[in-house]
Amino acid sequence: MEDFVRQCFNPMIVELAEKAMKEYGEDLKIETNKFAAICTHLEVCFMYSDFHFINEQGESIIVELDDPNALLKHRFEIIEGRDRTMAWTVVNSICNTTGAEKPKFLPDLYDYKENRFIEIGVTRREVHIYYLEKANKIKSEKTHIHIFSFTGEEMATKADYTLDEESRARIKTRLFTIRQEMASRGLWDSFVSPREAKKQLKKDLKSQEQCAGSPTKVSRRTSPALRILEPMWMDSNRTATLRASFLKCPKK
């Protein structure tokens, strides 16, 4: 699973996931499923934000190409992917600026158009079950919840899906692709079932040949979301690497 993750996700996403697991004292060599889940969640958060801006009139627009002459503001503030101290600093700044109620738990995004924090969920189970778990944990009507599944289902607070259908379809397609790629490598069952995960871990410890030697294909599309995070967690020497867009899983 670890090899699969490193080949199928952008290196910057992988690095963020590694830092997150290290921050919480988790070993990615053992918790490989969690490693994959964190990378998936990070990518969904970045895709959620990608290409969405607010123009001078305060309208939400989608721009896929950078226009240096356009006076645009990013619609979403990305909180996920930052270390806890910096994340809370961003949240406090947003609350002080917008008057938003400070959430009890760290959310994933802030939507400047709708003026609300957003909690993104990616589940391997039924969306309504995971939604209820999130809602019971957060216990706040102020934080908007949006859940995606690997089967193309989604659920959001008051059926308000925030994004346009095309943007959501892009996320669903990516999740479905990840599922298919995992299944083709015999990793999906262990990703879904803890019991199967233990069996897979034993296999992984015996052999690290899974996905080894496969060529990695790089899409040339730039991820604006990753660019937003650059000042917060990247140094200038790695800007070129940052600008590399999301990696696609190599075909068998």
Curated annotation (Swiss-Prot):
Give the keywords, sorted.
Decay of host mRNAs by virus, Eukaryotic host gene expression shutoff by virus, Host cytoplasm, Host gene expression shutoff by virus, Host mRNA suppression by virus, Host nucleus, Host-virus interaction
- Organism, as annotated: Influenza A virus (strain A/Brazil/11/1978 H1N1)
| Active site feature | 80, 108
Q: Where is this site: Important for efficient shutoff activity?
A: 28, 65, 202-203, 206
Q: What is known of its domains?
A: The probable endonuclease active site in the N-terminus and the basic amino acid cluster in the C-terminus are important for the shutoff activity. The C-terminus acts as a nuclear localization signal. The C-terminus is recruited to host protein complexes involved in nuclear Pol II RNA processing.
Subcellular location as annotated: Host cytoplasm; Host nucleus
Site feature location: Important for efficient shutoff activity and nuclear localization: 195, 198-199
Q: What is this protein called?
A: Protein PA-X
- Pfam families per the UniProt record, alphabetical: Flu_PA
Q: Transmembrane among the record's keywords?
A: no
Instruction: Tell me the GO molecular function terms.
Output: RNA binding
Summarizing the function annotation, the protein's role is:
Plays a major role in the shutoff of the host protein expression by cleaving mRNAs probably via an endonuclease activity. This host shutoff allows the virus to escape from the host antiviral response. Hijacks host RNA splicing machinery to selectively target host RNAs containing introns for destruction. This may explain the preferential degradation of RNAs that have undergone co- or post-transcriptional processing.
Keyword Phosphoprotein attributed: no
One GO term under biological process is: viral RNA genome replication
Gene (UniProt): PA
Tell me the protein family, please. Answer: Belongs to the influenza viruses PA-X family.
